[in-house]
């Protein structure tokens, strides 16, 4: 083949690859509601993802104690000076992000026992404030794609540096009774998207947040579990006490790599002996296909959600 032919073939291959991943308005899973379109691949795959109403943010569902769209936090008064710890009311301890918008000290799970608060709509610091990251939405091109064994998954089409915000896990914020009702209506063939986030606060109490993106949700619903995930879920509060479930890169993530987090809420599969006992004694569960060396062979199981109401 001539040099001209090789060059033409290379261009055709490049164009074909670009068409296979390049988002278009017609295939935007996010329906134009995110900063960037989210493509679907392959377009003609069957079965198609189950239909759902797209929302980039939490919405109040049945039984929710607080409407996540209500603004309940006061704003900071940082007008002439940048938001820094000690002077900004939103940064009581230390900066949440560095100059590159990366979450600080990613990789230390214990580090994020502390709360993360961003500046909100009532703050006087402006939208260019460094303490506004999660609220600014997607910054990397993502794609919903069909996996070999796990159904639909989510991957990145761009390099994502360690510590950068990737996406939220958004959906209906539910009360516990509604969670139990929905759980008991599920069949063995249904996917469970409901996530329970439990935060231990200084008074010894536990704050619970239940989010279900089954019917109303965002691209976070396509994230699969991994026992060695590349994402870390952090509750981030902006306008109210209802946290945004923000997913950050736990390491550098290469283009084409599937995005995943640990459904159990742990990170890097740090299983305590007590948790291991719960896993061994739990009823039959769905197999895990993450392929990690530390794979527990089954998807995490939260028995508290399956208790009789």
Curated annotation (Swiss-Prot):
It comes from Mus musculus. This is Histone-lysine N-methyltransferase SETMAR. The keyword Calcium does not apply. Zn(2+) 4 binds at residues 227, 288, 290, 295. The gene is Setmar. Residues 284-300 form the Post-SET domain. Residues 140-264 form the SET domain. Its EC number is 2.1.1.357. GO terms for cellular component: chromosome; nucleus. S-adenosyl-L-methionine binds at residues 150-152, 193, 221, 224-225. It catalyses: L-lysyl(36)-[histone H3] + 2 S-adenosyl-L-methionine = N(6),N(6)-dimethyl-L-lysyl(36)-[histone H3] + 2 S-adenosyl-L-homocysteine + 2 H(+).
